[in-house]
Amino acid sequence: MVYIASWDEFVDRSVQLFRADPESTRYVMKYRHCDGKLVLKVTDNKECLKFKTDQAQEAKKMEKLNNIFFTLMARGPDVDLSEVTGKEQMETQPAKKGRGRKQ
């Protein structure tokens, strides 16, 4: 098991690991509320990558990693990931205009 200190390196190596063997690669999140620690693990039974954090800002990055993995799983491992971000997907939803009754 390898703990990776840099978030960007963890994401890059995780995507490479998934693209190398998409059938057996899995992604696990574990959160311990009493410690406030989040551990992300990506493994393909040969190599195991781990990232540990206790920073709340990393939760937003975790959502982006989820979107990346969902895209890779749904569209295939050869998809271009340059357009995958959490903000762009959220902005495409139509905005609600009011709280009142529809007329």
Swiss-Prot record:
GO cellular component terms given for this protein: cytosol; signal recognition particle, endoplasmic reticulum targeting
Which GO terms fall under molecular function for this chain's record?
7S RNA binding
> Which GO BP terms apply?
negative regulation of translational elongation; SRP-dependent cotranslational protein targeting to membrane
Q: Which InterPro entries match?
A: Signal_recog_particle_SRP9/14 (IPR009018), SRP9 (IPR008832), SRP9-like (IPR039914), SRP9_dom (IPR039432)
Q: Where is this region: Disordered?
A: 81-103
UniProt-annotated location(s): Cytoplasm
Superkingdom: Eukaryota
One matching Pfam family, short form? SRP9-21
SUPFAM superfamilies documented for this protein: Signal recognition particle alu RNA binding heterodimer, SRP9/14
Q: Which UniProt keywords apply?
A: Cytoplasm, Ribonucleoprotein, RNA-binding, Signal recognition particle
* Subunit structure, as described in the record: Heterodimer with SRP14; binds RNA as heterodimer. Component of a signal recognition particle complex that consists of a 7SL RNA molecule and six protein subunits: srp72, srp68, srp54, srp19, srp14 and srp9.
Protein family (similarity comment)? Belongs to the SRP9 family.
Q: What's this protein's function? A: Component of the signal recognition particle (SRP) complex, a ribonucleoprotein complex that mediates the cotranslational targeting of secretory and membrane proteins to the endoplasmic reticulum (ER). SRP9 together with SRP14 and the Alu portion of the SRP RNA, constitutes the elongation arrest domain of SRP. The complex of SRP9 and SRP14 is required for SRP RNA binding.
What name goes with this protein? Answer: Signal recognition particle 9 kDa protein
> What does the organism's lineage look like at the top?
Eukaryota, Viridiplantae, Streptophyta, Embryophyta, Tracheophyta
